[in-house]
Amino acid sequence: MKETGKIYFASDFHLGLNTGTAPLDREKKVVRWLNSVAGDAKEIYLLGDIFDFWWEYRLVVPRGYTRFLGTVSEITDSGVPVHFFTGNHDMWVRDYFSSECGMIIHTSPVTTVFDGKTFHLAHGEGLGTKEKAYKILLAIFRNKTLRAMYSSLHPSIGIGIGHMWSLSSRLGKGLELQFYGEEKEDLLRYSKTVLTKENIDFFIFGHRHLAMKYILKETSEVVFLGDWIKHGSFAEWDGSALNFKMFD
């Protein structure tokens, strides 16, 4: 890994989703962004829902995404770490991304330090939620026995069902998402709970599809990374400041 350079954060590419930007155009845009930051990147963090649906069988992976996966592989081959956080749309990974593409896989939140500042990183699904139905749904998605049963389906059936499920979501239907305020936003509630246990300078989340910063208190800031369905948004740590940017 380089001793100097910038840290980049992005999430919610939803590669393969046929809503908003055309899927192939979105993938090409993501690849252009990766190539544009690779030269001065110390590390790149992809915070979940990179794919709109990803179910990895032991010997079979979903069709497509060759431009993206090839670019990531070139970046990791060059010595730049690329971190992949699973999201609620692509939590069903095995070892393909790590063994073939060189990515570092994270399945839970990570707290780390860059240049003396403490960062808490996560996709964000289920964190701080009070909705019992959503907690049950996530428990089903993560259940090893049920995952093994689903993997017994032929890939054409299993992946086909997954894409239909994704299109039935609010995101798949193209519905707008809104900010609900500090008391009702799950991830802000979660962040405040974390702050009772440790000091965090920056929380960075995906999942909400909101491109925004929120000052939780004088010394703690929350960043929602937005998405690449409409925004093309990302965050950049330059060693002293966290900058929020858009990629055209």
Please give the residue ranges for each predicted region.
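Core catalytic region of metal-dependent phosphoesterases/phosphodiesterases
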Residues: 2-6, 10, 15-114
